[in-house]
Amino acid sequence: FIGLYGACSTMSESLSMASLFLDGGFGSYIVASTSSHFSAAERQFRFPLEYGCQRCPTCQWTVTGSGAMVLGRSGDYPRVTYVTTGLVKDYGIKDANNMGAAMAPAAVDTIYNHFKDTGRTPKDYDIIATGDLGKVGKEITTKLLAEYGYDVKDNYIDCGDMIFDDERQKTDAGGSGCGCSAVVTCGYLYKKLMRREIKSVLLVSTGALMSTTSSLQGESIPGIAHAVAIEF
């Protein structure tokens, strides 16, 4: 067992590490997994549940969920073909209630570097999925990538934006947490791959590298994002 933590980018991080271990011959089967829990995240990073604090429109709700993928050396299954390890990006966002804005620059940087390194374009993927930028971060990411010359409007989704039904559940800017990209990828997207509805996914799980202490001290929130290409 190797414990990993990259905030909410952990699903992509664990998939990339598992892929590298397999490629290096250090295992035959490796499980990449992560999880999150709403109540645990609320108590640690926000407010006690009993406090009943009001939420602003940019707030996100931590997903209670877990996802796992088994990676092996052979079989008629989707393959991890590329891994792009992200860089920490800090654009000075200090609002812990707007983590989509804090993480978006890291997602944009990783996606841009992935395309630059591989020579690929958004059209090479059926779906480009960021982890938990939510409604706010997704909009920022779309605009920033357009400034780099990449139009992703037709095939870009965000796991945090789509995991809840905001009209019915009133979830503000959407979902977040390590389990957010994990359940959407291991459940929804993987089923689409296995049914051959899609052939390629670029998963870019995103994380806000903050602590309870740093937020209370008014420090900025660095972001991180790792990209993993999963293809048939």
Residues of each region from the PLM?
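Claisen-condensing/thiolase-fold acyl-transfer catalytic domains that form or cleave C-C bonds
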Residues: I2-F26, S36, S74, G100-A101, ...
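Long, hydrophobic, well-ordered secondary-structure blocks that form the structural core
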Residues: T34-E42, P48-L49
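Short, well-ordered, mixed-charge alpha-helical segments that flank or form enzyme active sites
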Residues: F38-R43, V88-G92, M210-T212
